[in-house]
């Protein structure tokens, strides 16, 4: 009897993760989490790169098989939170590296119906990766290691990442960083997060990557500048209010008794309805909830200097330098207190219409100039067909000068025109030959029972 080969646990879990039944897949995800915790707790334990690639193969098809939107979101959150089950930073980075390599490998096989849920999975994994840094206190070394991993697997020229993965990663990076660390990160730390993008934008020869980084990173920073400054001013006002409240607490200690007794006396009687008005602090809190959340803070002058340092190198391509210099000017204006002016839709529409009118006027002037150069105001000679139609309308003998210029005799032109014209009644301008009746003999006149022409003449006389 042949003994059955025992498969490694990673392969068994991958097979169950890619199963047809949802119950089997959910159970496999729970077992995988327990297996990761148990294996990484041991000193000699851990996963190899190949083992994690097999695990991610099963997780990829586990997400592939999930077809309900709410369940897709729940499964994506569960899969992305597996990074917290690893007990060491090296194992976490290896897990993230295997994820991005799996996405790069399988991206071209994803159809458009399943594309959105994998976009969501990428966003959730990036969010949990940044939460790992937050739990570690935003250590500089951990930040550098994670950014190096992401740049190597996604944006580096030697990476095998498709354009869809690159574009989506650049688009969501600042959004997820804002969600996780906008309340804690300083301007210097934020500069470290965007520093790899500065290097890639200055070195890359891919115009798509350059355009995505410029629009998704640098121009987003410029657009969010008013919100960032407003957020900073609100934070400073809050700190001033806290300091003022701490200083007033000591002076208000003796007056609390009188205030409490006065409030008791001003209470409405029982059974009456009193509509409370919101206080100023509550209104401010409501406005803060209605407005957007915190925004990343940047030192615009430091960002401009860093970009200028990378763009001014001799190895930087000319098109990259030209594009980055435009962004540098905007950042320098922000550092000097000049904000970019947003065009009002009415003004933009008016400017567009004026541009169209100017183009139309230029086109008309160009056509008029060409006509003047061609004939200096003279009319172009008509075509032979048009000349024939005109001659039919006015008759051949009406224009003897044109007939003389053509070198034809009057009789010849008339005969040629009559030969070309169709025979029929109602032809305008056609010359018909008059028929002269032949004189009837007496015998023929009697047979036809008509009088002779001579007798008719006598009667008419």
Curated annotation (Swiss-Prot):
Keywords: Methylation, Nucleus, Phosphoprotein, rRNA processing. Methylated at Gln-427 by N6AMT1. InterPro entries: RRP1. Residues 253-267, 371-381 have a biased composition (Basic and acidic residues). Residues 239-252 have a biased composition (Acidic residues). It comes from the Eukaryota. The modification Phosphoserine is found at residues 245, 247, 250-251, 383. One of its GO terms (cellular component) is nucleus. GO terms for biological process: rRNA processing. Belongs to the RRP1 family. Its main location: nucleus. It comes from Homo sapiens (Human). This is Ribosomal RNA processing protein 1 homolog A. The modification N5-methylglutamine is found at residue 427. The modification Phosphothreonine is found at residue 412. The keyword Disulfide bond does not apply.
């Amino acid at each position: 009897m042949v003994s059955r080969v025992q498969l490694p646990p990673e392969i068994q879990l991958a097979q169950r993760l890619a199963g047809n039944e949802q119950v089997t897949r959910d159970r496999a995800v729970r077992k995988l989490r327990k297996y990761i915790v148990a294996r990484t707790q041991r000193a000699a334990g851990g996963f190899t790169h190949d083992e994690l690639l097999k695990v991610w193969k099963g997780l990829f098809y586990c997400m592939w098989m999930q077809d309900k939107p709410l369940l897709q979101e729940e499964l994506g959150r569960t899969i992305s939170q597996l990074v917290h089950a690893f007990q060491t930073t090296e194992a976490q980075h290896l897990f993230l590296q295997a994820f991005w390599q799996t996405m790069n490998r399988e991206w071209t096989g994803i159809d458009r119906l399943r594309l959105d849920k994998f976009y969501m999975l990428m966003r959730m994994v990036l969010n949990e990766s940044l939460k790992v840094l937050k739990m570690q206190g935003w250590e500089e070394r951990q930040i550098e290691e994670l950014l190096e991993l992401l740049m190597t697997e996604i944006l580096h020229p030697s990476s095998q990442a498709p354009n869809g993965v690159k574009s989506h990663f650049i688009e969501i990076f600042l959004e997820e960083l804002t969600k996780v660390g906008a309340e804690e990160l300083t301007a210097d730390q934020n500069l470290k997060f965007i520093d790899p993008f500065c290097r890639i934008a200055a070195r890359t020869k891919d115009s798509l990557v350059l355009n995505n980084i410029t629009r998704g990173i640098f121009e987003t920073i410029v657009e969010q500048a008013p919100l960032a400054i407003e957020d900073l001013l609100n934070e400073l006002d809050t700190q001033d209010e806290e300091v003022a409240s701490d200083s007033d607490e000591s002076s208000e200690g003796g007056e609390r008794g009188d205030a409490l007794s006065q409030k008791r006396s001003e209470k409405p009687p029982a059974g009456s309805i009193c509509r409370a008005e919101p206080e100023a602090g509550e209104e401010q809190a409501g406005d803060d909830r209605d407005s957007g959340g915190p925004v990343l803070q940047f030192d615009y002058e430091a960002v401009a200097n860093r970009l200028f340092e990378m763009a001014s190198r001799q190895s930087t391509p000319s098109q990259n330098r030209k594009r980055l210099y435009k962004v540098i000017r905007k950042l320098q204006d922000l550092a000097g207190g000049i904000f970019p002016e947003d065009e009002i839709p009415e003004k933009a529409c008016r400017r567009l219409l004026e541009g169209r009118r100017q183009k139309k006027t230029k086109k008309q002037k160009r056509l008029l100039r060409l006509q003047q150069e061609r004939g200096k105001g003279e009319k172009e000679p008509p075509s032979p067909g048009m000349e024939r139609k005109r001659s039919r309308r006015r008759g051949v003998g009406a224009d003897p000068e044109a007939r003389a210029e053509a070198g034809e005799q009057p009789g010849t032109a008339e005969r040629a025109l009559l030969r070309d014209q169709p025979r029929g009644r109602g032809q305008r301008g056609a010359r018909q030959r008059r028929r002269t009746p032949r004189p009837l003999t007496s015998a023929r006149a009697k047979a036809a029972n008509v009088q002779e022409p001579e007798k008719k003449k006598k009667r008419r006389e």
